[in-house]
Amino acid sequence: MCGVNYQDHPSREASARELIESAGGRMPQETEGSLRTAVANAMVGMKKQLYGRGPTAAKAWILDDYVFVVLEGGLTRNEETLLADGKADLVREYRLSFQETVGATAMGAVEELLERRVLTYHSQIVFDPPRTFEIFVLEPQ
């Protein structure tokens, strides 16, 4: 499992705007639907920027103090090769370790877009079909 606490990674890398633009999107207006789209685009942009390949589809939900993002596809060719050889655990371990390393970027993008502090962040991946799940816990309002 990959979990990142806000206190563990206070520094930020790419801004939400940079991540969204790298996914081909634009910054949102102040509607809930556009914020969900912006969060999804920021996660796509982060994966694209850091893995060299992005998901094929993404959707985000914002519910009270929680943000859930589901990303479809986006495995790299070397990850697909390892999966074909039965090494799903190795791919999962690498992905989750990498997400811990770049968690501050994901958290920073969500904080910037929603204007709320992220208390903790968790990432998980499954392979059949390939899906990545990004979960953020927001500070209560």
Task: Go through the PLM ranges and name each one.
Residues 5-9:
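Intrinsic-disorder-associated, low-complexity terminal segments enriched in Asp/Asn/His/Tyr and depleted
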Residues 11, 15-16:
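Intrinsically disordered or compositionally simple regulatory linkers and C-terminal tails
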Residues 19-141:
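Interaction-mediating elements
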